[in-house]
Amino acid sequence: MAQRKILITSALPYANGPTHLGHLLEYIQTDIWSRFQKLQGHEAYYVCADDAHGTPIMLNAQKQGITPEEAVEKVSIERQRDFADFNIKFDNYHSTHSQENKELSELIYNRLNDAGHIKRHTISQLFDPEKGIFLPDRFVTGTCPTCKSENQNGDNCDSCGATYSPTDLINPRSVMSGAEPILKDSEHYFFDLPAFEGMLKEWLHSGTIQQEMANKLDEWFTDGLQQWDISRDAPYFGFEIPNAPGKYFYVWLDAPIGYMASFKNLCDKKGIDFDAFWAADSDAELYHFIGKDIIYFHSLFWPAMLEGANFRKPTNVFAHGFVTVNGEKMSKSKGTFIKARTYLDNLNPEYLRYYYAAKLSGGIVDLDLNLEDFAQRVNSDLVGKVVNIASRCAGFITKKFDGKLSATVMQPQLLKEFQAAAPSITAHYENREFSRAIREIMALADKANQFIDAAAPWVLIKDETKQQEAHEVCSLGLNLFRVLITYLKPVLPEMADNVEAFLNDDLAWDGVQNALVSHPINKFKPLMQRVEMDKVNKMVEESKESLESKVTIDPNSPLAKEPICDEIEFDDFAKVDLRVAKIAKAEHVEGADKLLKLTLDLGGETRQVFAGIKSAYAPEDIEGKLTVMVANLKPRKMRFGMSEGMVLAAGPGGKEIYILNPDDGSEPGMRVM
């Protein structure tokens, strides 16, 4: 088989928050494919980087009182540790905020500009007059122009699903300051995407992406492609556009160039020929693994940019679906929005690698992580089937046969059946049909266990006349196990490493065609523990605690101005006796600027209360009304007399004070519960 040159990427994770199990699907999928290609002997490289630019990162850094670079580094350290602990092995992990990315972004931009593919237009944008910044879509909220729902984002409505421009919002507000944005003109730079329409139509239907995605992207051509805004105004964290002071590359322009930059960084360190992989006439293969939500960036904008800048286009763009948990969208309140680190604190990372592989196909379907099925499948397949083969054979080899396998292979036809599965399993991995590969491997594991069950070496070993047969049964069992683990090596690299140490053998893909005979092995050690549901449940509970739902609060709202107090115990709250009271009489208090003297009827007794509501109410406006009072508050002696309770009211003060009024049907003396 000829050696191929292969460059593999996953989408660059945005450096603005922790990794969760939904993110990990893509990196596990890509890592499995990368490991498989390397096992085939190909020159394959898997690169990635932090997506480090944009307004959200800039603002997040400001909140923390650190620089954007420091904010990115903080997230990157945590993320790379998570990736490493999930056995995701990059050949290089870099950052889009790098010298390589700056140089390549400028190179591509200059080539596009020189070729006439960069246009300039003046546009009107919402601008925060208090913060002095143009507002991205998600930094504006207001009332939906379609359904009139309040507190909706600047680009789409969560209530009715409508999409719109931020300028279409009713009563828009800046998320940053609460101020009403103003419209302000600015010159922006645009990439002339329509100039590449013919090329894109042909490229999309040349087998470069899944057919269902190609059909979906055809919708972009129905109304005609639009020029793409590739600039943002200062202040902005990113790279300044050449010869355009105060203008910066939009994050989605330099983010995919980050693939090139990370590989360039690797090339410079390892002496690899960069142009052999990226030149327009390159015969290397380039594969992008991405989520289905960013397909249009990678299959419209990105190939057009590469074409216009005289670089090669991707060989394939592989899109995958989203992760659900227990059949539902990941939920913080239910504890199913699980961070990578929370998982790692409780469970073996290879459990998840296997479960994802067992459900992944080459299509674009969402993957459900059903936690009960997850435990059952790992326990049944890996512990009950695969590891069980070795655990039932290894001990006899060590104790009875000096730790050496037999000199001959009994039932060579059975071993050949396992070896003959290599081309089929190879094809499944190549086509990203991991679930099919797993099904075929597990079917072989069933056959291995059936062989051992029928041969019963634990019975043979007790018969002195059948020692050789017992030796050969256990030796064949371990040879079958060796083939299975080799097939699983891209999925379970840590287990494969441990098996290599146990068998004293390098598990090479073409090595399955040979048998281990008269071969010494080491003492068997447990390779995998069963998944315990109490640990799964503990992980879910910890996710509820560590990822408790946070509500986005309008900075101009009462809740933002006066946050909720610390929690109290229910017993403390139960001590407060709230009662409905009728304001029988209200009077001005001589010498008091803020107080009214209220006589409250509790339906059997009266109380005198001094309330600081004079700025909002005249006495005659509230006499006869029902309100709510704290009836068991210890009387307090004031300069104007004794106050025997407290009336409940809301508001920031001044004219904005609002007495609480119980609903119709309430009577004086009733307890409020």
From Swiss-Prot:
Annotated localization: Cytoplasm
Origin superkingdom: Bacteria
tRNA-binding domain sequence ranges: 572-673
Record keyword Ligase present: yes
First-tier enzyme category under EC: ligase
Motif ('HIGH' region): 13-23
Catalyzed reaction equations: tRNA(Met) + L-methionine + ATP = L-methionyl-tRNA(Met) + AMP + diphosphate
Database matches in CDD domains: Anticodon_Ia_Met, MetRS_core, tRNA_bind_EcMetRS_like
GO biological process terms on file: methionyl-tRNA aminoacylation
Cofactors named for this entry: Zn(2+)
Predominant subcellular localization, coarse grouping: cytoplasm
Cofactor: binding comment: Binds 1 zinc ion per subunit.
Pfam entry (one): tRNA-synt_1g
Enzyme Commission no: 6.1.1.10
SUPFAM superfamilies linked to this entry: Anticodon-binding domain of a subclass of class I aminoacyl-tRNA synthetases, Methionyl-tRNA synthetase (MetRS), Zn-domain, Nucleic acid-binding proteins, Nucleotidylyl transferase
Keywords: Aminoacyl-tRNA synthetase, ATP-binding, Cytoplasm, Ligase, Metal-binding, Nucleotide-binding, Protein biosynthesis, RNA-binding, tRNA-binding, Zinc
Family indicated by similarity: Belongs to the class-I aminoacyl-tRNA synthetase family. MetG type 1 subfamily.
Complex formation: Homodimer.
Annotated NCBIfam families: metG, metG_C_term, PRK00133.1
Role, per record: Is required not only for elongation of protein synthesis but also for the initiation of all mRNA translation through initiator tRNA(fMet) aminoacylation.
Protein name: Methionine--tRNA ligase
Organism whose genome encodes this protein: Pseudoalteromonas translucida (strain TAC 125)
